Regions:
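Short, surface-exposed ligand- or partner-binding patches at beta-edge/loop junctions that are enriched
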Residues: 61-62
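Rhodanese-like catalytic fold shared by cysteine-dependent sulfurtransferases
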Residues: 1-19, 26-57, 66-97
């Protein structure tokens, strides 16, 4: 079972103690993102997976939460402590605006 967190709880986390993987496309990421997050668009997932450090818990989101759930499964299979942010950016932005 994939670990999940609500967008509301995610925005309350201390971002300096976690790794954030933002799977939105580069243009969306450049418009707004969390400082220190890693942008790995869905289209470049396999090329970017090796850039994710394992030292901290990893929180992953895409635009809606679908692709990030798939990425969390793959990261867990590779030994990461990974969590999917439910609802993705569409939900997150409700709590940061």
């Amino acid at each position: 079972m994939v670990k999940e967190i609500s967008a509301q709880d995610f925005v309350k986390l201390d971002k300096t103690k976690i790794t954030i993987v933002d799977m939105r496309e580069e243009t969306e990421y450049s418009d707004s993102h969390f400082e220190g997050s890693i942008n790995i668009p869905v289209s470049k997932f396999w090329a970017g997976i090796d850039n994710i450090p394992k030292e901290k818990a990893v929180y992953v989101f895409c635009n809606s939460g679908y692709f990030s759930e798939e990425m969390v499964i793959l990261l867990e299979e590779r030994g990461y402590d990974a969590t999917n942010v439910l609802g993705g950016w569409k939900e997150i932005k409700k709590f940061i605006i």
